[in-house]
Amino acid sequence: MKTLPKEKRYETLSYLPPLSDQQIARQVQYMMDQGYIPGIEFEKDPTPELHHWTLWKLPLFNASSAQEVLNEVRECRSEYSDCYIRVVGFDNIKQCQTVSFIVYKPNQTRY
């Protein structure tokens, strides 16, 4: 029986193979279509009981396309290549984070 390599899983989408830029853009566009405000966070060790994620810049209040968010993800990835990076969606009516998914893992492999 063939099994997947052992690696930490953090969120629902982390059970899928790593997302391509096009797949990330589609997820971000869906999030924006729902009215959520995108933000980018990063963390070296994303274990929930140990750390909080650090917000990359401010949430992208004026983002009008998924490409703008992807550009920020790339910029964050180039500066913090040793960190996990995720995209989050904030609901300004409920005033909470409603969506999040990891878009980059350090030493990421495709299987």
Curated annotation (Swiss-Prot):
GO biological process, alphabetically ordered: photorespiration; reductive pentose-phosphate cycle
Single GO MF annotation: ribulose-bisphosphate carboxylase activity
One of the Pfam families matching this protein, by short name: RuBisCO_small
Other comment: RuBisCO folding and assembly commences when the nascent large subunit folds with the help of the chaperonin GroEL-GroES. Requires homodimeric RuBisCO chaperone RbcX2 to assemble into RbcL8 octamers, making RbcL8-(RbcX2)8. The exposed C-terminus of RbcL binds in a cleft in RbcX2. RbcX2 is displaced by RbcS; as RbcX2 is removed RbcS mediates the ordering of an internal RbcL loop (Thr-63-Leu-69) in a catalytically active conformation. Interacts with accumulation factor Raf1; dimeric Raf1 acts after chaperonin GroEL-GroES, binding to RbcL(2) leading to an RbcL8-Raf1(8) complex.
Keyword Heme listed: no
Chief place of localization: other
GO CC annotation terms, alphabetical: carboxysome
Quaternary structure and interacting proteins, as annotated: Heterohexadecamer of 8 large and 8 small subunits.
Superkingdom of the organism of origin: Bacteria
Key words, A-Z: Bacterial microcompartment, Calvin cycle, Carbon dioxide fixation, Carboxysome, Photorespiration, Photosynthesis
Full protein name: Ribulose bisphosphate carboxylase small subunit
Function, as annotated: RuBisCO catalyzes two reactions: the carboxylation of D-ribulose 1,5-bisphosphate, the primary event in carbon dioxide fixation, as well as the oxidative fragmentation of the pentose substrate in the photorespiration process. Both reactions occur simultaneously and in competition at the same active site. Although the small subunit is not catalytic it is essential for maximal activity.
Subcellular location(s) of the protein: Carboxysome
Family: Belongs to the RuBisCO small chain family.
InterPro entries attached to this UniProt entry: RuBisCO_ssu, RuBisCO_ssu_dom, RuBisCO_ssu_sf
Cited Gene3D superfamilies: Ribulose bisphosphate carboxylase, small subunit
